[in-house]
């Protein structure tokens, strides 16, 4: 996993950049036949990485990694290629092959990391300025928006995933001086940045149980399942599920000042 992204001696990452396949369940996810039960059965809510091979060249580093659940079952294989150019841009190319004997459904396919809550100035080009998911985003108009993690987070009575944005071209996370991280991709992606950890969001039963730890949680998703209407109607339609097949995606991260 990528453990450091540095700008003039200042560390930008609070946690490593890792693969993410799960989201804290929404009310709909808990009732959907393709939702949270299948994700938890596969152990996607508690993943670790085991390096199988590592190759380095003058321009890049390639890592093959087994993605394991808490039972040490392999849920898939990921290949990460990290390339750094002379301007400080870090390209992270990821290929993931799920093991479909274990994995029957995925909430998302992307990368996640945490940063200091100082990086709370968020701007992006994508659908906004409200929350959007792949199966409910027509109300979001594509444009450049400025927001904060606090504004992106919706305080549901029962804490759950929230704050997603779709059809994103780029996103910038910065502190009040303008220093931070700029992210872009070679295709439209989804992202969220919220003021709580996924672990806490999953564990908390009520709003008053949400406690801040000084960090923000960032998700950069090549794919994320829709939310459906399973609490009162149909679940997520097939075309809005994450495909269970080998997929590749790429994000480029730039330290900015």
List each language-model region with its residue ranges:
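Beta-strand/loop-rich accessory regions of lumenal/periplasmic or secreted enzymes
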Residues: 1-257
